[in-house]
């Protein structure tokens, strides 16, 4: 069984939106979160989707599920105090749906330019290696800095990747790590791959497209709209 856990828990402070979290902003009559879920909905290998949502917007999210006929969404749950805790709540909900050896794909609700090919590659990688971290090769040189903002290391670009999403694992593995971490007071890991790395779990890269952006700022929003329009034009004009 393959389950998508889609995190839509942010409130969009960096987007400067008033009243509506960024994941609910609309592009061509459809909220960003729905654009994202649609990809999972239309991927044959995905059996179910869990959405983790801002608690005040649960009813709104449930209405979207019904309005856009998102039949693979089997649960909409409230997020936690941190991103990690929100994902944990989604994983717990997935556990209620899962069969043995379930694969979970943890994805950002504001990454709507994911595609079926990457989703399938994640599932394949988990079954072969136990993990999949969707990533892109660094286009520019990555540097590490010290506390004085001085460069302490220039990283070899040929070995540098940028981690994105989905980040995928066997559900039992990521839940085991999450529960142990929480029991030790670790509740604010930046993402699931970071947490698994803290536990020395082997992480495998799955290369994804550069356009798999996370919509965090107004610039990201307009970039998504431009890329979405370009995709639509390709289909219309047969480009």
UniProtKB/Swiss-Prot annotation:
<dbReference type="GO" id="GO:1902012">
    <property type="term" value="P:poly(ribitol phosphate) teichoic acid biosynthetic process"/>
</dbReference>
<comment type="similarity">
    <text>Belongs to the IspD/TarI cytidylyltransferase family. TarI subfamily.</text>
</comment>
<keyword id="KW-0808">Transferase</keyword>
<feature type="site" description="Positions ribitol 5-phosphate for the nucleophilic attack">
    <location>
        <position position="157"/>
    </location>
</feature>
<dbReference type="InterPro" id="IPR018294">
    <property type="entry name" value="ISPD_synthase_CS"/>
</dbReference>
<dbReference type="InterPro" id="IPR034709">
    <property type="entry name" value="TarI"/>
</dbReference>
<keyword id="KW-0548">Nucleotidyltransferase</keyword>
<dbReference type="GO" id="GO:0071555">
    <property type="term" value="P:cell wall organization"/>
</dbReference>
<protein>
    <recommendedName>
        <fullName>Ribitol-5-phosphate cytidylyltransferase</fullName>
        <ecNumber>2.7.7.40</ecNumber>
    </recommendedName>
</protein>
<feature type="binding site">
    <location>
        <begin position="80"/>
        <end position="86"/>
    </location>
    <ligand>
        <name>CTP</name>
    </ligand>
</feature>
<keyword id="KW-0961">Cell wall biogenesis/degradation</keyword>
<dbReference type="GO" id="GO:0047349">
    <property type="term" value="F:D-ribitol-5-phosphate cytidylyltransferase activity"/>
</dbReference>
<dbReference type="InterPro" id="IPR029044">
    <property type="entry name" value="Nucleotide-diphossugar_trans"/>
</dbReference>
<dbReference type="Pfam" id="PF01128">
    <property type="entry name" value="IspD"/>
</dbReference>
<feature type="site" description="Transition state stabilizer">
    <location>
        <position position="22"/>
    </location>
</feature>
<comment type="pathway">
    <text>Cell wall biogenesis; poly(ribitol phosphate) teichoic acid biosynthesis.</text>
</comment>
<dbReference type="GO" id="GO:0008299">
    <property type="term" value="P:isoprenoid biosynthetic process"/>
</dbReference>
<feature type="site" description="Positions ribitol 5-phosphate for the nucleophilic attack">
    <location>
        <position position="214"/>
    </location>
</feature>
<feature type="site" description="Transition state stabilizer">
    <location>
        <position position="14"/>
    </location>
</feature>
<dbReference type="InterPro" id="IPR034683">
    <property type="entry name" value="IspD/TarI"/>
</dbReference>
<dbReference type="GO" id="GO:0005829">
    <property type="term" value="C:cytosol"/>
</dbReference>
<keyword id="KW-0777">Teichoic acid biosynthesis</keyword>
<comment type="function">
    <text>Catalyzes the transfer of the cytidylyl group of CTP to D-ribitol 5-phosphate.</text>
</comment>
<feature type="binding site">
    <location>
        <begin position="7"/>
        <end position="10"/>
    </location>
    <ligand>
        <name>CTP</name>
    </ligand>
</feature>
């Amino acid at each position: 069984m393959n389950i998508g856990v889609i995190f839509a828990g942010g409130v969009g402070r960096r987007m400067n939106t008033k009243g509506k979290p960024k994941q609910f902003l609309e592009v061509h009559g459809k909220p960003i979160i729905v654009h994202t879920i649609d990809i999972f909905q239309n991927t044959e290998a995905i059996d179910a989707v869990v959405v983790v949502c801002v608690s005040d917007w649960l009813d709104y999210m449930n209405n979207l599920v019904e309005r856009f006929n998102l039949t693979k969404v089997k649960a909409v749950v409230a997020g936690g105090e941190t991103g990690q805790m929100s994902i944990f709540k989604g994983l717990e909900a997935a556990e209620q749906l899962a069969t043995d050896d379930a694969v979970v794909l943890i994805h950002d609700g504001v990454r709507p330019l994911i595609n079926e090919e990457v989703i399938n590659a994640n599932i394949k990688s988990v079954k072969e290696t136990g993990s999949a971290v969707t990533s892109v090769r660094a286009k520019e040189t990555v540097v590490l800095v010290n506390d004085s903002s001085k460069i302490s290391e220039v990283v070899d670009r040929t070995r540098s990747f940028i981690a994105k999403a989905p980040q995928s694992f066997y559900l039992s593995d990521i839940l085991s790590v999450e529960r142990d971490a929480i029991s030790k007071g670790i509740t604010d890991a930046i993402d699931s791959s970071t947490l698994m790395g803290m536990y020395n779990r082997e992480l495998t890269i799955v290369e994804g497209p550069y356009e798999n952006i996370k919509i965090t700022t107004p610039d990201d929003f307009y970039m998504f709209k431009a890329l979405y329009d370009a995709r639509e034009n390709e289909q219309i004009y047969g480009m």
